[in-house]
UniProtKB/Swiss-Prot annotation:
The gene is addA. Pfam families: UvrD-helicase, UvrD_C. One of its GO terms (biological process) is double-strand break repair via homologous recombination. One of its GO terms (cellular component) is cytosol. This is ATP-dependent helicase/nuclease subunit A. Heterodimer of AddA and AddB/RexB. GO terms for molecular function: 3'-5' DNA helicase activity; 3'-5' exonuclease activity; ATP binding; ATP hydrolysis activity; double-stranded DNA binding. Its cofactor is Mg(2+). PANTHER family: ATP-DEPENDENT HELICASE_NUCLEASE SUBUNIT A (PTHR11070:SF48), UVRD / RECB / PCRA DNA HELICASE FAMILY MEMBER (PTHR11070). Belongs to the helicase family. AddA subfamily. It catalyses: Couples ATP hydrolysis with the unwinding of duplex DNA by translocating in the 3'-5' direction; ATP + H2O = ADP + phosphate + H(+). The heterodimer acts as both an ATP-dependent DNA helicase and an ATP-dependent, dual-direction single-stranded exonuclease. Recognizes the chi site generating a DNA molecule suitable for the initiation of homologous recombination. The AddA nuclease domain is required for chi fragment generation; this subunit has the helicase and 3' -> 5' nuclease activities.
Length: 1262
């Protein structure tokens, strides 16, 4: 291969052509990124600056890679431009501007747009990006909970109750909540969510009294019926032709009669009577096909026409009858009308939810990614001069807009790009992608945008031009041939949204591969029901006694593991593209691609058992790991111990260590009630002198656990979540314990990841343990695990990742795992189906009969979604196959070899190269393995290897692809020998090793010195060097004991630090309903008013109220808090002796004065022996007044004063805050150098000034 890359004619066209919009269809391995980078360089050579090009990528990683590649290319151009100073200066400028160039995801570009042009749409520029989807979901849940209550309360028509009943179960209304959230998500992917929601009921609006003359039937249902009947007619016509050719006259006549009946039904489809059409299909006269004996020489042809054409046609019509024609016209129209009422109510509810959610985000100053994109579109397109100016400015700025992975954009993103692009025929959009690799439908990606442009540019050259990059420079020829063999039979416009013909097929371009390297494509099929053939053999019997495959997933992985061992043992040659040389295959060359993450734990466990190093790049089984399940169970019972399953999990775990018998004892002790009550009852009713040793042991474990649980519950109420988690790790030793387990380093990394996730969670708008548990539950529901912190893995290890995760990557050897897994059809089931294009289709629950029936709108929408889902599955398979450079293995399972081949031979029903749509859609064949099997079974090479004399398809006779199909049983796998010995062998080896180890004699005196060592400054380690006054004030609460605490180590060696924190925490917002302002909030507000009040003039009630009103207007105070402030008590302060002095000398008043004071630690902690240890005390003084005689200190307090015993209550307040005032006084004395001539507490609750005894000041400051 030459050092300089030479471009193909189509690549060169994509690099240099300008003047209009360009759509580049770049197949897998076609070098699209290289083309993009080179196009940027060529554009720069024409004088366009890097700041004049907008490059939009699908991911941040892709943007970073693009920026890096452009930087490398620019440096190369700079190197070759030596001697041309002007050119060098230009390239240097581009390099300098590259870090701030517009190369990013579209989200990031929109965010920059908002930060720059927020004023165009009156957006508050101070906002936080709600990037965590789980936090976003929790916030939506809160908003929905509040809105739902309002909707119930104001449901005068009862329509909302009907909506709830229609979509929710008997226990809760979660079904409706899920529907609202999903509808909201679909709406947000459109350029105009409000309009999309408003149009949802439109398909249910019947504009005629006859169903078949309505717009819905004419536009949606009739075309579907016609296509189904045309397919049916085509099958019967093929059967008729086959019968005529073979001289089967009776059969031909029978099929002809059936065809006449089909023609009659087709006429009714275009008529106006639903009931007539329904009756014709329900009573369709198939008659009986004349039989042919199996001994007759014509039987094979008869069997072919019947099984390949006639029977499928009959099943197709039967499906229409049972699915679409259950109800008569009146019933169907009633269902549609009533369903339309519910859809209209849903539209109203989701619109209300959007409004409420937007308001809540505004209140919290947050935006999510959808908000950012919609706001960007509003900036560019709203009807205002400013918007038009911004759009024009951006169109002028960007000479070209490059969009990578265009097939994964949605309608909203398309609208944004269109708003800043030059319109055709001078278009400046350069879009590159491959519709065959569009696999993000679940993110609302719309591949039809790509296809629409393809068709548009083909029809109108002025609109733009299509360029196809078909050469695959990644894979060996057989990988290309095998992929083409599959997809030319599988993918077409009808079902795959693109015809896999001509330019869409892969063309071999990687001619640099040497002939010494072979390329293979193999099916590895594990047979679940085939028994060992040599069961009577003694060796087999011995093997079976020790070896067992528990399930098909384990069997598949063992099959793959042994294949990998074989490849490595054989030193299979591969071509190293980076080193440009042939070398033996290593584990690092092999990647396992999975359709989901479900079986990743099985894969890793089995491969490691075989001694195969493995790393899971996107494991996402984090919450399934033992250590995390135990920690989450513990957090659940700390939040609420009355949960049996989490409690049992913790008791059984190493944290407590109860076994099954001990757990049973607790339940036997109290057979009724929840398990936590049984645990408590056991502890409380325990009588030591009547207990057995077994019971004593259980009691010790349970008592210790309950003590820890109470301690953890206290921490959860008083401290941060991360403090709780770390305390659990320390107190239980669980973090250290898992480090000693297999894969201990990874397990510890997982626990650290939980801590870090809790830390980031608390930086969001949610707090507390309860919400964190909900947060994690939502992560699990979304299958969005916290992936544990990565542990450095060996470079030479097999990789495991999902197909989605592999997109854009390439590997020498690929195993496509779990290929027989049935496709997920959840989005086509349930009470409703939804599509961004066709809207929503629902089941209607009749409130009287309690019968639920699907609306015709649902059936049509479900059919469209089914086809879109199958098309996406085809694209996922295409992505998986095209990741391979030289070898690809498809791994799945079947019951038996005969069952597998029999299923695949249904492909013989297809007379054309592309398999019949009915076969590709068939539920029992809806998986990768059967799709591929059907594509291979018609190939002559398959028949030659596995099915002698079977029918093949002539169109595949010369196909160049080579492949192999292997069927494997559990007997074939046999017992596998991994690197791990049995427990007995391991212990024996460990014992032998230990026996050989010699140790020096122990110096017992030195050992005692080590064990008895006590750090001389132990007290300092338990004392924070920083104390706030609010923490230190308790120093003086007890006049007889002027100490905060006394150092004492616990039994575990843990030390309680010398620092006091408040135990009075505000009730979290999420637990409040209609809440009253807290006393602390009112107190803080009152302080603020006193701070803001102008004392240069005599205060009045009106002036005090004016300050309060202004603070409310500035949104510093809420109206509820403001109403609880008492202006007359504030005013009364200025009638006191100190208040009068303040008014007399306002320029000597100092308010809200912060201070920091270094104090000897011994003055705070009596157990300190060090004389030089100091503590920094920090606080804020409410106010002080300087006078010629000295300083007068005062502090406002809003504490309640007991009117029944006022003197005692005041005395208690003075004792409580005396220490705090004394600290203030000591600080002021040091700050001002003046004596303290008075110190007071002003009690706002009663409007009185109270003196603090002066001797306490002297005691501290001496």
């Amino acid at each position: 291969m030459s050092t300089k890359f030479s471009f193909t004619p189509s690549q060169d066209q994509a690099i240099h052509q300008t003047g209009n919009n360009l759509l580049v269809s770049a197949s897998a391995g076609s070098g699209k990124t290289r083309v993009l980078v080179q196009r940027v360089i060529e554009r720069l050579k024409t004088g366009v600056g890097i700041d004049q090009i907008l490059i939009v990528t699908f991911t941040k990683a892709a943007a970073a890679e693009m920026r890096e590649r452009i930087q490398t290319a620019l440096r190369q151009e700079l190197a070759v431009s030596q001697g041309d100073s002007a050119q060098q200066q230009f390239y240097l400028r581009q390099l300098n501007q590259l870090p701030v160039a517009d190369i990013s995801t579209l989200d990031a570009f929109c965010l920059r747009l908002l930060q720059r042009y927020y004023y165009v749409i009156d957006l508050d520029p101070v906002f936080r990006l709600l990037a965590d989807e789980t936090e976003n979901g929790l916030l939506r849940d809160e908003v929905w909970a509040d809105l739902r209550e309002d909707l119930y309360a104001n449901d005068d028509s009862g329509l909302f109750a009907r909506l709830t009943e229609n979509f929710s179960g008997d226990r809760n209304d979660q079904g409706l909540a899920d529907l609202v959230q999903q509808t909201y998500t679909f709406a947000n992917a459109t350029p105009n969510p409000t309009a999309w929601l408003a149009e949802l009921p439109q398909p249910y609006q019947l504009d005629s009294d006859q169903l078949m003359t309505t717009s819905f039937y004419q536009q949606r249902l009739r075309p579907f019926f016609q296509s189904q009947l045309q397919q049916l007619q085509a099958d019967l016509t093929s059967a008729q032709a086959l019968a005529n050719q073979a001289g089967l006259d009776k059969q031909a006549a029978h099929v002809t009669a059936v065809l006449e009946n089909v023609a009659a039904v087709q006429q009714l489809v275009t008529g106006d009577s639903w009931n007539a059409l329904r009756a014709a299909i329900q009573d369709f006269a198939w008659g009986r096909m004349p039989a042919v004996r199996k001994t007759n020489e014509d039987y094979p042809i008869y069997n072919e026409l019947k099984t390949t054409y006639y029977d499928p046609a009959r099943k197709q019509l039967d499906s229409l009858k049972k699915t679409y024609l259950i109800q008569d016209e009146q019933q169907a129209m009633t269902t549609i009308r009533r369903s339309g009422e519910l859809v209209g109510e849903l539209s109203r509810v989701v619109t209300a939810f959007r409004t409420a959610y937007r308001q809540e985000k505004q209140r919290r100053h947050v935006l999510d990614f959808a908000d950012v994109e919609h706001a960007a579109l509003a900036i560019l397109t709203q009807d205002s001069d400013q918007s038009r100016q911004v759009a024009a400015q951006l169109r002028h700025q960007f000479a070209e807009i490059m969009v990578d992975e265009y097939q994964d954009t949605n309608g909203l993103q398309e609208a944004i790009l269109t708003a800043i692009a030059e319109p055709a025929p001078q278009g400046n959009l350069f879009m590159v992608g491959d519709v065959k690799q569009s696999i993000y439908r679940f993110r609302q990606a719309d591949p039809t945008l790509f296809m629409t442009k393809t068709d548009q540019y083909a029809a109108d050259a002025a609109a733009g031009e299509l360029i196809v990059l078909a050469e695959n420079f990644r894979s060996m020829k057989n990988v290309d041939d095998f992929t083409n063999l599959i997809f030319k039979q599988l993918m077409d416009r009808e079902l795959g949204e693109i015809d896999y013909t001509g330019a869409a097929q892969l063309k071999f371009g990687a001619s640099y591969y040497p002939d010494t390297v072979t390329s293979t494509a193999e099916l590895l099929v594990y047979l679940t029901e085939d028994a060992p053939e040599s069961a009577g053999d003694a060796d087999s019997e011995a093997m079976d006694a020790t070896f067992q495959v528990d399930n098909k997933h384990q069997g598949e992985v063992l099959m793959v593991g042994q294949k990998i061992q074989q490849l490595i043992a054989d030193q299979t040659p591969i071509y190293d593209r980076e080193a440009k040389q042939v070398r033996p295959m290593t584990y690092g060359d092999i990647t396992l691609l999975t359709p989901t993450r479900t079986n990743n734990l099985i894969i890793t466990d089995e491969l490691r058992r075989l001694g195969i190093p493995v790393v899971v790049n996107d494991a996402r089984n984090y919450f399934k790991t033992t250590e995390i399940q135990i920690m989450m169970a513990l957090l659940q019972i700390i939040d609420n111990p009355y949960q049996d399953i989490p409690l049992a999990a913790v008791l059984r775990s190493p944290i407590v260590g109860l076994n099954e018998n001990e757990l049973a004892l607790l339940r036997i002790n109290q057979r009724t009630g929840d398990y936590y009550q049984a645990v408590l009852h056991f502890q409380r009713s325990f009588v030591p002198n009547q207990a057995s040793d077994f019971q004593q042991a259980v009691y010790q474990k349970v008592s210790h656990f309950l003590e820890q649980l109470q301690e953890f519950r206290d921490i959860a109420q008083q401290d941060e979540l991360v403090t709780l988690i770390w305390r659990i790790y320390q107190e239980t030793g669980f973090l250290d314990y898992v480090g000693g387990m297999p894969a201990g380093e990874q397990r510890q990394a997982n626990l650290h990841a939980l801590y870090e996730r809790a830390k980031s969670y608390e930086q969001s708008s949610f707090k507390g343990l309860f919400q964190f548990v909900r947060f994690v539950e939502r992560l699990q529901e979304r299958d969005d695990d916290l992936a544990g912190a990565p542990v450095q893995a060996a470079d030479d290890a097999v990789s495991v990742m999902t197909i989605h995760g592999s997109k854009g990557l390439e590997f020498p050897v690929v195993f496509i795992m779990d290929a027989s897994r049935q496709f997920n059809k959840q989005d086509q089931q349930g009470n409703y189906v939804m599509s961004g294009k066709t809207g929503i289709g629902i089941d209607y629950l009749d409130p009287d009969s309690r019968v639920k029936a699907p609306s015709l709108q649902k059936l049509v929408t479900a059919q469209a979604i089914s086809r879109a889902s199958l098309a996406e599955e085809m694209r996922k398979l295409y992505v998986a196959l095209t990741r391979a450079e030289s070898r690809v293995y498809i791994v799945g399972s079947h019951k038996t070899q005969e069952a597998a081949i029999s299923a695949w031979e249904q492909a013989y029903q297809s007379p054309n190269l592309v398999l019949n749509a009915t076969l590709r859609e068939k539920n029992t064949l809806a998986n990768y393995l059967d799709w591929i099997g059907m594509c291979l079974v018609r190939d002559p090479k398959f028949a030659a290897e596995l099915r002698q004399g079977t029918t093949t398809f002539s169109g595949l006779a010369g196909d160049p692809a080579t492949f192999a199909v292997h069927f494997v049983t559990a007997h074939d796998l046999g017992p596998t020998q991994g690197v791990n010995e049995t427990a007995v062998d391991w212990l024996q080896a460990a014992s032998e090793t230990a026996a050989k180890v010699t140790t020096p004699p122990v110096d017992t005196e030195q050992l005692h010195q080590i064990m008895d060592f006590r750090y001389p400054h132990q007290a300092a380690t338990a004392t924070t060097a920083y104390q706030s006054v609010s923490e230190a004030k308790r120093l003086f609460e007890d006049p007889d004991n002027a100490t905060i605490g006394e150092y004492q180590a616990s039994a575990t060696g843990q030390v309680g630090g010398h620092r006091f924190v408040t135990h009075d925490f505000a009730r979290p917002d999420f637990l409040q309903t209609v809440r009253e302002p807290l006393a602390t909030e009112i107190g803080s507000a009152t302080h603020l008013v006193l701070q803001q009040l102008d004392v240069t003039v005599t205060p009045t009630l009106d002036r005090v109220q004016g300050v309060i009103d202004q603070l409310v207007a500035d949104q510093v105070l809420t109206a509820e808090v403001a109403q609880r402030i008492q202006p007359e008590l504030i005013l009364r302060f200025f009638s006191s002796s100190v208040g009068q002095q303040v008014l007399a000398a306002p320029d000597q008043l100092h308010r809200e004065v912060p201070f920091s004071l270094l104090m000897p630690a011994r003055s705070l902690f009596q157990d300190f022996q060090e004389t030089d240890s100091q503590v920094l005390v920090h606080g804020i003084i409410d106010g002080y007044l300087t006078t010629p005689a000295g300083v007068i200190l005062f502090d406002y307090k809003t504490d309640h004063v007991n009117a029944q015993n006022q003197a005692a209550s005041i005395e208690k307040i003075v004792e409580r805050y005396g220490g705090q005032v004394n600290l203030y006084a000591a600080a002021l004395k040091q700050m001002t150098g003046q004596p303290i001539v008075g110190q007071y507490l002003y009690l706002l609750a009663i409007g009185e000034l109270v003196a603090v005894p002066e001797q306490q000041v002297r005691r501290l400051s001496e």
